[in-house]
Amino acid sequence: MVTRLADIFKRLRLGRDYEDIIDTVPIDDGLQANIRNIEEKSKELNKSLYGKQQAYAEPFLEVMDTNPEFRTKRSYMKNSDNLHDVLKQFGNNPILNAIILTRSNQVAMYCQPSRYNERGLGFEVRMRDLDAEPGKKEKEEIKRIENFILNTGRDKDIDRDSFQSFCRKIVRDTYTYDQVNFEKVFNKKNATTMDKFIAVDPSTIFYATDKNGKIIKGGKRFVQVINKKVVASFTSREMAMGIRNPRTELSSSGYGLSEVEIAMKQFIAYNNTETFNDRFFSHGGTTRGILQIKSEQQQSQRALENFKREWKSSFSGINGSWQVPVVMADDIKFVNMTPTANDMQFEKWLTYLINIISALYGIDPAEIGFPNRGGATGGKGGNTLNEADPGKKQQQSQNKGLQPLLRFIEDLINTHIISEYSDKYVFQFVGGDTKSELDKIKILQEEVKTYKTVNEARKEKGLKPIEGGDVLLDGSFIQSMSLNTQKEQYEDTKQKERFDMIQQFLNSPDDEEPQQESTEDKVDGRESNDPTKIDSPVGTDGQLKDQDNVKSQEGSNKGQGTKGKGNEKPSDFKNN
């Protein structure tokens, strides 16, 4: 190879023809080998990804963040780096607060153990397996867990939040930020024992990132940021993170989608409408009109100045509403300044905004004091089927909004608190609206009439079976069963009668001590005095009882034909 290259350089130096040199340049086998090696490594890399996540959960090009230690919650709004700051600005909206306070009060009804309530309303810790029966040890541990949740800690501390206060806080947090955070504090001596849990401001908790800007999957995954500085870091076990509306969007960085963010336009429109309507009163624009009196040109300017002073002094503010200013002029003319209905349709517009916001939170506007009379704007059209029954509307509203909220809180407690004790227990809210319970009873009544027996229904409720409970409580079914029972009883009676007759027939008179019968009865075949004998028309001699005894007559004739033989007479024989 070296000799070949030296020959080529020599020919080039001497100026010889070099066209044949191009054809004789050897192929670099090493380059092709490197290409093949890269291809093989690429295939091996793809094979190594099998069994691991291949889809991207974060942007391929890492987000350029001014804070490299954590990932902020970004907003679709312009000039906003942290969505938490934007959402916090709308936290004082009256419609949002009406929804939050309503749901908080409803959740607070469940924030005590159900065993403390006569109606069984509250929360309970039970066995995860419904078929498992808790023993004495399990029952004691269940009560201990319930008391821990009720006091938000192992001991009762008046300076610490109760479970009701804790739930009120996280309801506001999840409805504002769609993020709930609470810290779990463990015992200093025993790191496996949790002492208490405390709600934390979610606007200060962020996902931590490594030096490459990627979200940390393990270890100190969460950080608390105050004034754009990291002040504390937590593991997934130490800091609970609850997202009610998760999403797969890469730019979301694992954060949820708040209803406030979705309805941002509606909240801004509501604030603008209230501000516009408020300024209509506060800036003196409430006069109904002007009484204009025409005057000479020299007096017009002076009258205008007087009018301005009078307007500012007498007609500004709420006390100047609906007053009529008067100016000097030659002619009198009234200028109407009262806005028409088309210019101030605030009611329908505000009703529309309230309905949109309420729909996002799954709550009926009537629950927050804005009854909807049909349609998106509260008009007469579009009445719902359940409008005549406010109770049904309220129950449906709670099923859409309250029940999912309770399930969300249940999942938080089970994931981050109950799991610290044992996986065989589960936390849940029980009880509810009385009307709903009555509806369940009505459903159960219909079930036991169609396909479920009484004992099956009692078993589902944890009750013992009762005698005669393996039936359906349906009139037609019970009547049919009664007819079948009567038929079976009739058949049994007939069968018994037949059996008695056969038994009576099979009872032979030889089974008892025979009674003395006269010879005449035996001969004539007359009925015996023995009550055990069957009354038969045939006598013992084989002849009918109602006919003359032939053998008796033959014996009588023979006796008459043998005179002198014996001392007995036929009459004596007969009398015997």
UniProtKB/Swiss-Prot annotation:
What is the protein's given name?
Probable portal protein
State the organism of origin. Answer: Staphylococcus phage Twort (strain DSM 17442 / HER 48) (Bacteriophage Twort)
| Pfam name, any one | Phage_portal
Provide ranges: composition bias, Basic and acidic residues: 519-533, 565-576
Query: Mind listing the GO biological process terms from this record?
Result: symbiont genome ejection through host cell envelope, contractile tail mechanism
Give a GO molecular function annotation for the protein.
DNA binding
The opening ranks of the lineage are: Viruses, Duplodnaviria, Heunggongvirae, Uroviricota, Caudoviricetes
Q: Which UniProt keywords apply?
A: Capsid protein, DNA-binding, Viral capsid assembly, Viral contractile tail ejection system, Viral genome ejection through host cell envelope, Viral genome packaging, Viral penetration into host cytoplasm, Viral release from host cell, Virion, Virus entry into host cell
Renumbered residue ranges of the record's region Disordered: 374-399, 506-576
- Family named by the database record: Belongs to the phage portal family.
Kindly state the subunit structure of this protein. Answer: Homododecamer.
Domain of life, per lineage: Viruses
Role, per record: Forms the portal vertex of the capsid. This portal plays critical roles in head assembly, genome packaging, neck/tail attachment, and genome ejection. The portal protein multimerizes as a single ring-shaped homododecamer arranged around a central channel. Binds to the terminase subunits to form the packaging machine.
